[in-house]
Structure formats: C-alpha cells, structure tokens
C-alpha cells in the first residue's frame, strides 16, 4: 500500500483474511507458512486453498469414495455435492457452511489504509 502514498489514506478495502484472528490451528499454520516463506504471512487466499483441499479430503472420507476408476463419474459427483452443501466444516480460521456452493456464514473483513498500513475496521458476515 506504499505505492499510492498519502493518496490512499482513508481508502477502505475488503479481504477474506484478517491476520489478527487467532486460534490454535490458524496460529500454527501462520507460523509454518512464515517459516516456509521467508517470514511472510499467508496471502489472502491461502486459507481458502487450504480449506478447499481439506473439504475435498473430508468429502472423500465421509461419502465412501473408493477411487475405483469404474465409479469415477459417480464419485466425483459425490464429492462435488458434499462440498456444495457442507455444514459445520471446520476450516482453518473458523467453522462454516455452504449452500449450493456459496458460503453462508463465512466472514469478509473491511480495512482502511492509513500511512501505508491496513487497519482493521469491521468483520462482515452474510
């Protein structure tokens, strides 16, 4: 946010990620990410990618997917249907639900830029 200098002061932006959220699982992930990425904190979509992979893993485990090539189309549908309407998914940051492929209670965050720094303003939940 330094490129715009003082012209960015007061500009509000949204993000899927608030690095200040704290829970044991997220804190452990942040530390491991920083270690693997030269001290950088996770990027805004990092938790989304992480959750997507673990949601697919959970779908495979809970729907009886076998990996049988003869059932490929059927089993892919099981995974997709599970993920599209999962309830109580324990994600990296919080527990959340999906309805028809859309998160129903997953927050976004509003930040305001001041002197090149993003400052938290508000958590917004659908």
Residue ranges and their predicted role:
Residues 1-126:
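Extracytosolic ligand-binding ectodomains
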